[in-house]
């Protein structure tokens, strides 16, 4: 993968290039750019599709603690590096967290948003102790003992094996001396700020996609985003889909994304 050095971080990314409008996909926690493979294949004939690995994920190392505001700055700087003035920002879960913050930071750079299984608020306090336990077990023993639980939250049954291999390879790369690569992204997730009260400042068009069986973020939280945004919002429920609906239900998600993108004004 090519690497862009921005904000003191070497960011791994992919870029289909071409002359079409740019769409930048940002992945969820514990995932990487490959979670959008089906979207890249579907959109590439008409759009310039960019994916990237965020700090502490995939091929991108974190140099220290960071927030989703830093990640928003990263995606905007990556756009600068690639000569992209304006783009649709598409994000799954934490990818949506940073995409919303990018829209707040530089509204003139964000043509539209695609928010997949995401939210604007804080983590549910009822889930926090369990997530802390999972993180600690992952640090101490690797993903093996908890990967089935994690996969069931993100993917639901039946699509686990490929991600098991990814998680174990990543852990082996960092253990035992560089496990802060796991902790810094986790703390970013758990300690993030609540931007629900600022949603009205986001006035670009938005597509909100959410799985009806999302065990990580209830659909009601996506409805809160829809209702709070200051611009036109299209809301699509993906029937039966878990947290990573673009991975498990790519046909439905791709159809909705293409319909939304094709309906945007030029520019």
Regions found by a protein language model. Name each.
Residues 9-64:
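Conserved HGGG/HGGXW glycine-rich cap/lid loop of the alpha/beta-hydrolase fold
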Residues 100, 104-105, 110-141:
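Flexible "cap/lid" loop of the alpha/beta hydrolase fold
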Residues 124-129, 143-200:
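Conserved alpha/beta-hydrolase catalytic His-Asp/Glu region
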Residues 37-41, 50-90, 255:
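Active-site loop/oxyanion-hole signature of alpha/beta-hydrolase fold enzymes
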Residues 241-254:
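Catalytic histidine-centered segment of alpha/beta-hydrolase-like enzymes
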Residues 223-244:
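Catalytic histidine neighborhood in serine/cysteine hydrolases
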Residues 202, 208-210:
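Short beta-strand/loop motif that positions the catalytic acidic residue
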Residues 213-217:
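Acidic catalytic loop of the alpha/beta-hydrolase fold
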